Amino acid sequence: MRSIAFVLLISSISAVFAQPSAKWTVLGKEYAVDTLKHCQVGPGTVLTILDLTGTDRQRVFFTTTDLTNHIVRIKTICGNNNLKTNLTIPQMIENNGDKANEYFAGVNADLFSANGPIGTTVVDSEIFKTARSTTDWYSVGADAGKNLHFGQFYTTFRLTSTTTGQMSVKSVNTPRESNDFVIYTDKYGASTGTKSSGVEVAAVAVDGGLSAHGTSKFRITGLPQSNAGNMAIPSGGIVLSANASWYMEPLQKLQIGDIVEITPTFTLNGKVVDQITEMSGGCPMILQDGKILDTDKLLDHLSYLRP
């Protein structure tokens, strides 16, 4: 059966339908609101277009989707499956489409730094990136049951092997900081971009990529390199990169053929969220528990009437 993908993770927010000539106040300005269109555009999905007339003229477009529809999927698209790829939305859809999926609604999510999305990114259950806790960035995640989870996720990683014992990885695909331990996957680029200090060791996946749920296994393919930096990332593999002695010493013991196991845990408001399949970041939150939040001053560009 042909499945229908609801692209990205944010467009499912519902809004109150405006009655003809209703009055709205937006950023202190009053508008007359008329509904120009309200029609079905896909399975379980309607498009609403509103016309706001006042001192300024505004046009509002939004979709409302019933995620319980059995042929609607929630899917994150990240460029050309590379964190640093800069593509338009039509290009992203073209590169990620196939005969089994038709993309019909979506929204541009997260903001980009030079190293890709700021927030945690999960695509088809594979971890593309985790956000540093210092960013205070929010994310919306979808689990296997198509339940949405909004907030500031805290992600931890347990790495184990018979050679190193148990270790705690700090992040995935972020620039390495001091006293750090980062996993770099091929979604980050061709190499880690790290400086010469530290230890790095490459591995390839045994049973798929770095999964957002469960344990992923990787096989070490080369001897650890010390004080070299910028190690090449194998296709379909990872590089373990550390520059603190308590991480470096165990990594230096790894041998070719050793198996390392990596298990992530996603925590939201102190509770573990299981079976995450998709996630994308953004800031700030604008709607929570059915209430519009007063967050338009948190980022300077939000005070304007248009992005």
Describe these PLM feature segments.
Residues L254-I262:
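Loop/turn positions that initiate beta-strands
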